[in-house]
């Protein structure tokens, strides 16, 4: 991981295209960057550890005319972040250059074999092993050579390869790692992310697992896993990169926080009819909900916390066993799956490898699979039995905000749809739940207008090193997402707990200077939360309350983020928006790179 781009064109501007494309995928996170391009004297590789700017400055030393090349931003999985471990990688003879997203599981045994044959390696990566193997097995034909290589390796990968014997050609393939082809006029592209090439084309081919593609400036030839030449559908991407630009905001994150009212309204308008009934008939075709006796919601990170909200909605409204699991653990927890199981997989990018592998496992066990994703044509949406798209639009900041809200809202609507199908929700309650969505939108707008109050709180807590986020019931799910936002862009250790669990050990860590964020949107449990606040205040904690109007929390805390009532199930979503602001402004005050936090990637495509 993380970003791939390739170019073959009639103009000698490959380096410019590659650097521009890598800039567009910086948001995915990386620790080094590099490019390889074909010149009259062969293949030239230039790469640098650190920010892309380092590579750009380095390239100012060269005057390069090249029509074909590949580029990569790397996130270290094998070998520390250095120039030598950055992609692309040569073969020893420098006839091959290769970039790779993924992990080669058996690289150690192949490397040992190549070392015994006298091959000299110049990096510590699993990727270089593939470049060296390709060179060793090369038979004068790119396609047959790559097929021999793929028979030797195990793992997940998206490869892009150039060879000195074919100066105008790239050969690429994918297996459980995203790769697309962009079609232009006398120029064609490959990329891991459509953002990288939107400046040049909106005509996209989404490759499937097992596909191998040969790309020149005028031709794209795709072979499937059975080695048959196939025609993949060309899809037109509707959004352009300008939609993903900052639009006058200081950072993508705050822009995306403040796009949430629009997304709430769009989701309501698209997924309900004029009578305000949820219309998922097309998306959920073929599912008989009367046959479903168990539901799993599986995801990673923020999507998992959105899934916890979805679990709460479904258990409350449907009376069905609903379980959530972290995707990286799902396969190893021996989930009970039958043909009466509905397994829901949530992924913003649709390319999260742990989630994809979990879905594959569930399908093999006989579950009906439903994907909730933000990216049209992504792997998860192609492989699931059914798909509901979130309508968040491109999310660039690594810290997810609007994607979370849209995931929660889709699961809320899904719960209402299922409840109506099963006769579990009375009509008056159903209409109240639907009207709460419009109320949520109005109240997010109001919260946005009051954001400077949250900024003031952030100024007071910016130097705090440790914190706890507490809540009860659905608010405990809010606590988890709030805690994650704070830690991922502020590098503050925070822990989310059910408020009642604090006294079972963790209260030993409460002392002066510790931050506690106490969440209370359910007035039935408000007094218990107030009691927990008093416990931590007595031990010196600085307490920020996050609650709805009518709560007693403001009377006992140091600062408060107070939101308006948006209904029993959606007020917690509004509270999360407040906690997104708190994390954002704290990071701003600390002077950190809000959109690109250290050690994080937007889309995690390795296990």
UniProtKB/Swiss-Prot annotation:
Keywords from the named record: Aminotransferase, Cytoplasm, Glutamine amidotransferase, Repeat, Transferase
GO biological process, one term: UDP-N-acetylglucosamine metabolic process
Keyword field contains ATP-binding: no
Residue intervals of the Glutamine amidotransferase type-2 domain: 2-218
One family name in Pfam for this protein: GATase_6
Gene Ontology cellular component terms for the protein in this record: cytosol
Catalysed conversion reaction: D-fructose 6-phosphate + L-glutamine = D-glucosamine 6-phosphate + L-glutamate
EC number: 2.6.1.16
InterPro entries: GATase_2_dom, GFAT, GFAT_N, GlmS/AgaS_SIS, GlmS/FrlB_SIS, Ntn_hydrolases_N, SIS_dom, SIS_dom_sf
Top-level division of the source organism's lineage: Bacteria
Residue ranges annotated for the SIS domain, each copy included: 280-424, 457-597
Principal location listed in the UniProt entry: cytoplasm
SUPFAM superfamilies named among the record's database cross-references: N-terminal nucleophile aminohydrolases (Ntn hydrolases), SIS domain
Cell compartments where the protein resides: Cytoplasm
Active site: 2, 602
Enzyme class: transferase
GO MF annotation, one: glutamine-fructose-6-phosphate transaminase (isomerizing) activity
Function text: Catalyzes the first step in hexosamine metabolism, converting fructose-6P into glucosamine-6P using glutamine as a nitrogen source.
Listed HAMAP family: GlmS
Oligomer and partners: Homodimer.
PANTHER family recorded: GLUCOSAMINE--FRUCTOSE-6-PHOSPHATE AMINOTRANSFERASE, ISOMERIZING, GLUTAMINE--FRUCTOSE-6-PHOSPHATE TRANSAMINASE (ISOMERIZING)
Protein name, UniProt field: Glutamine--fructose-6-phosphate aminotransferase [isomerizing]
Gene name of the encoded protein: glmS
């Amino acid at each position: 991981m993380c970003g791939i781009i390739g170019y073959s064109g009639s103009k000698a501007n490959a380096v410019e295209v590659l650097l521009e494309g890598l800039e567009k995928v910086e948001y995915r996170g990386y620790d080094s960057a590099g490019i390889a391009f074909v010149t009259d004297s062969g293949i030239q590789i230039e790469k640098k550890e650190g920010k892309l700017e380092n590579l750009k400055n380095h390239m100012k030393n060269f005057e390069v005319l090249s029509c074909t090349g590949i580029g990569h931003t790397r996130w270290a999985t094998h070998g520390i972040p250095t120039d030598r471990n950055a992609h692309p990688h040569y073969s020893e003879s420098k006839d091959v250059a290769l970039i790779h997203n993924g992990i080669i599981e058996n690289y150690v045994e192949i490397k040992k074999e190549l070392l015994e044959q006298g091959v000299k390696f110049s990096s510590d990566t699993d990727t270089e092993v593939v470049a060296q193997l390709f060179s060793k097995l090369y038979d004068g034909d790119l396609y047959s050579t790559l097929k021999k290589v793929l028979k030797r390796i195990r793992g997940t990968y998206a490869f892009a390869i150039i060879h000195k014997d074919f100066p105008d050609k790239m050969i690429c393939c994918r297996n459980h790692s995203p790769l697309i082809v962009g079609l232009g006029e006398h120029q064609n592209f490959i990329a891991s992310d459509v953002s990288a090439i939107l400046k040049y084309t909106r005509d996209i081919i989404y490759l499937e697992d097992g596909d191998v593609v040969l790309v020149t400036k005028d031709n794209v030839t795709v072979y499937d896993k059975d080695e048959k030449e196939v025609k993949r559908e060309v899809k037109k991407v509707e959004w352009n990169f300008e939609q993903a630009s900052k639009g006058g905001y200081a950072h993508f994150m705050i822009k995306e926080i403040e796009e949430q009212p629009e997304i709430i309204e769009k989701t309501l308008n698209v997924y309900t009819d004029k009578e305000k009934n949820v219309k998922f008939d097309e998306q959920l075709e073929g599912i008989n909900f009367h046959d479903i006796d168990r539901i799993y919601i599986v995801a990673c990170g923020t999507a998992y916390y959105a899934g916890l909200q979805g679990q709460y909605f479904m258990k409350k409204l449907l009376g069905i066993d609903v379980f959530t699991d972290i995707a990286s653990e799902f396969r190893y927890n021996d989930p009970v799956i039958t043909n009466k199981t509905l397994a829901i997989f949530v992924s913003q990018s649709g390319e999260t490898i742990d989630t994809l592998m979990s879905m594959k496992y569930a399908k093999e066990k006989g579950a009906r699979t439903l994907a909730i994703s933000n990216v049209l044509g992504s792997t998860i949406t192609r492989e699931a039995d059914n798909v509901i798209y979130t309508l968040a639009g491109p999310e660039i900041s690594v810290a997810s905000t609007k994607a979370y809200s849209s995931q929660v809202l889709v699961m809320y609507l899904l719960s209402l749809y299922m409840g109506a199908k099963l006769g579990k929700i009375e009509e008056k309650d159903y209409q109240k739940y639907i009207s709460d969505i419009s109320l949520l939108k109005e109240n997010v707008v109001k919260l946005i207008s009051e954001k400077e109050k949250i900024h003031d709180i952030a100024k007071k807590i910016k130097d705090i090193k440790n914190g706890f986020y507490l809540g009860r019931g659905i608010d405990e799910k809010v606590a988890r997402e709030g805690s994650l936002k704070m830690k991922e862009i502020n590098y503050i250790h925070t822990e989310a707990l059910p408020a009642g669990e604090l006294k079972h050990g963790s209260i030993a860590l409460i002392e002066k200077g510790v931050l506690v964020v106490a969440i209370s949107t359910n007035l039935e449990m408000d007094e218990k939360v107030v009691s927990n606040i008093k416990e931590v205040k007595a031990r010196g904690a600085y307490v920020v309350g996050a609650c709805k109007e009518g709560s007693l929390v403001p009377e006992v805390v140091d600062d408060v983020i107070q939101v308006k009532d948006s209904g029993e199930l959606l007020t917690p979503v509004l509270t999360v928006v407040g906690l997104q602001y708190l994390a954002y402004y704290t990071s701003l005050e600390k002077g950190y790179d809000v959109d690109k936090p250290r050690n994080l990637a937007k889309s995690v495509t390795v296990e």
